[in-house]
Curated annotation (Swiss-Prot):
It comes from Pseudosoriculus fumidus (Taiwanese brown-toothed shrew). Core subunit of the mitochondrial membrane respiratory chain NADH dehydrogenase (Complex I) that is believed to belong to the minimal assembly required for catalysis. Complex I functions in the transfer of electrons from NADH to the respiratory chain. The immediate electron acceptor for the enzyme is believed to be ubiquinone. It is an enzyme of class 7 (translocase). Its EC number is 7.1.1.2. This is NADH-ubiquinone oxidoreductase chain 6. Belongs to the complex I subunit 6 family. It catalyses: a ubiquinone + NADH + 5 H(+)(in) = a ubiquinol + NAD(+) + 4 H(+)(out). One of its GO terms (cellular component) is mitochondrial membrane. It is a multi-pass membrane protein. The lineage of its organism: Eukaryota, Metazoa, Chordata, Craniata, Vertebrata.
Amino acid sequence: MMTYIVTILSTIFVVSFVGFSSKPSPIYGGVGLIVSGGVGCGIVLNYGGSFLGLMVFLIYLGGMLVVFGYTTAMAMEEYPEVWVSNNTVLLTFLLGLVGEVVLMIYLLLGEEEVKFEVVLNFNSEGDWVIYDTGDSGMFSEEAMGVAALYSYGYWLVIVSGWSLVTCIIVVMEITRGN
């Protein structure tokens, strides 16, 4: 069941990035980034990194959404161009979407000799997503996530905070007209 969930979330992740890259207006690009950020956090949550998924969700979608709101308000068009207005972009997007759906249906519900297999070996994913506590199972994953964020991931907190402050200062200078 988890393989199906990760496959569906990965498909939505790819489709949202295709929608972001084929944006005709800044508003639709931001929507694609919001969807891809939320789905990416869902993938991390599915692998057991609940605190990491929550932190990325709060930092990315909370902080950068403010910057996105200011910048789209400054670049707002009265009648924004939509994906339908450019037939080539729309047909390319739809063709990629249909192709990916057909491929996923073929791989997941295919014949007996064609089975969907995960090629990568995920034996050491504990080092990637969650802070591995070893044999001491008495600690909560949430508390270990906080400890890992502020001990091993202090650079992430510093870089995230600094980049958010820089973005807000730049947006404030742009909106004031300087």
